[in-house]
């Protein structure tokens, strides 16, 4: 894509009430997706929320991912299934929402349910090698860089740090 070429997303409207994804502010990275009908997301369950759109065209060399909206997660414990939408996908863009609370949540028609975030398409050559190339980290993982002095496992649970965040 040349520096003068405009990045373009074009959608096919599959429901009469569908809205184009849009950003609330010029500096926002995510394009909000809207529900086209009232939907009840069952407590401790999930549902696919229709948005009434199909991807019609995306500038070559780009793809997007369905990402959460922070307000739904913090206020209502709702999170979308993170989904990669490849440039060539032309199916329905319905969003699966998970409800991590134990109460049913009703989403009104027109609710912002998730956002699309664009990414450049980067690929790599994939191959086997006989041995791993040596690296500073080695095979250390799962908290290996935590400061051991920060935790006294005799006095606390790993979950104690999360008590300040109330559940919805």
State what each model feature region is:
Residues 1-168:
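DUTPase catalytic domain/fold
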């Amino acid at each position: 894509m040349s520096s003068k070429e405009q990045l373009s997303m074009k959608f096919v409207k599959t429901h009469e009430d569908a809205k184009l994804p849009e950003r609330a502010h010029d500096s926002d990275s995510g394009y909000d997706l809207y529900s086209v009908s009232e939907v009840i997301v069952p407590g401790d369950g999930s549902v696919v929320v229709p948005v009434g759109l199909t991807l019609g065209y995306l500038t070559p060399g780009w793809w997007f991912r369905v990402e959460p909206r922070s307000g739904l997660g913090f206020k209502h414990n709702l999170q979308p299934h993170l989904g990669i939408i490849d440039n060539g996908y032309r199916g329905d863009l319905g969003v699966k929402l998970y409800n991590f609370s134990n109460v049913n949540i009703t989403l009104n028609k027109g609710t912002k349910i998730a956002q699309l975030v664009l990414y450049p398409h980067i690929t790599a050559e994939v191959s086997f090698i006989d041995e791993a190339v040596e690296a500073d980290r080695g095979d250390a993982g799962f908290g290996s860089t935590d400061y051991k002095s920060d935790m006294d496992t005799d006095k606390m649970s790993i979950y104690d740090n999360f008590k300040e965040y109330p559940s919805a």
